[in-house]
Amino acid sequence: MYYGFDIGGTKIALGVFDSGRQLQWEKRVPTPRDSYDAFLDAVCELVAEADQRFGCKGSVGIGIPGMPETEDGTLYAANVPAASGKPLRADLSARLDRDVRLDNDANCFALSEAWDDEFTQYPLVMGLILGTGVGGGLIFNGKPITGKSYITGEFGHMRLPVDALTMMGLDFPLRRCGCGQIGCIENYLSGRGFAWLWQHYYHQPLQAPEIIALYDQGDEQARAHVERYLDLLAVCLGNILTIVDSDLVVIGGGLSNFPAITTQLADRLPRHLLPVARVPRIERARHGDAGGMRGAAFLHLTD
C-alpha cells in the first residue's frame, strides 16, 4: 500500500492508495504548531493506524510546502513551524523503519495528475498552479524533476517576457514580488494578479470570482479583461514551453475552475512558440483536494 501525506499549516492529511492507485482510506488530524515531537508523533500514529488497518508496512511519501531537504538535511517550511529547520525525512525514516520520501506540494500536485489513468500516456507533464500564487512541477516518466534546490517548476518567479511588456504597454507597472525580484509573473497571473489587473485598468476593486461572474453574464468590460489575461498567460506559458516542451499541461488552483482558462488557451499559444513546436494538450486538474495525498503516495510508484 502507498501512504501519502499532504501536510500544511493547519492539517495533516493521510491517504492510503492500493496498487491500482485507488484511494482506500483517509484521515486528517490538526498540524501541531509548536512541538516537533508532537508533530512526529502525529505522523507516526497515522502510519501505525494504517499499517494495522491494512495489515502491511506501507510506503510513506510526504508533500509539504517549502524545501523538503536543504543542504544540511533539514526541512524549510515556513507554514509548518514545528518541523521547519528539523531533519524530518531522516527522523521519520528512523522512527518508521522505512524509506520516507519528501517533496514539495506543487510537485505532488503535478505527480498526482501525471498518474491519472488517461494522462499516463504522456512522458513529460507540466503541472501549472494558478491560485493564490503561481507554481507547479514537472514530471518525466512518472517521476518529479526536483533540481538540487527543489525549485524546478517555480514558474511564478520567472519575470515578464519582453513580448508581454509590448502587449501590455511599455509603461506597464513592474511590481515587486515577495521573493524580492521585480516583474515576477505570479503578480499578474495568480488569482490575486487577475484581480490586480482589473483594478489597474478599470480602477475598481473586485476579486476574481466577482470578475468571472460578470464575464459569465456577458459584461463587455469583464470579457475584455479575460481576453487580456489569457493573452498574457499565453505569452508567459509560451516562453516556458519553449524550454520545457511538455506533452501535457494540467492546470490547477482556483483559476482552473474558470473554463475559459483551459478551453481558450491552446489557440493562443502557437504565435508564442517556435514554428516547429506542437501545442501540448491542456487540461484542468482532475483530482482536486486529494491531489496532494495522491502525489505524495506516488513518490514510490516507480520503484
Curated annotation (Swiss-Prot):
The keyword Kinase is annotated on this UniProt entry: yes
Broad enzyme group: transferase
One Pfam family matching this protein: ROK
Catalytic activity annotation: N-acetyl-D-glucosamine + ATP = N-acetyl-D-glucosamine 6-phosphate + ADP + H(+)
Binding site for ATP: 4-11, 133-140
InterPro entries: ATPase_NBD (IPR043129), N-acetyl-D-glucosamine_kinase (IPR023505), ROK (IPR000600), ROK_cs (IPR049874)
This protein's pathway: Cell wall biogenesis; peptidoglycan recycling
Keyword ATP-binding attached: yes
Enzyme Commission code(s) on record: 2.7.1.59
UniProt: Zn(2+) binding residues: H157, C177, C179, C184
GO MF term set: ATP binding; N-acetylglucosamine kinase activity; zinc ion binding
Example GO BP: peptidoglycan turnover
Similarity field: Belongs to the ROK (NagC/XylR) family. NagK subfamily.
Protein name, per record: N-acetyl-D-glucosamine kinase
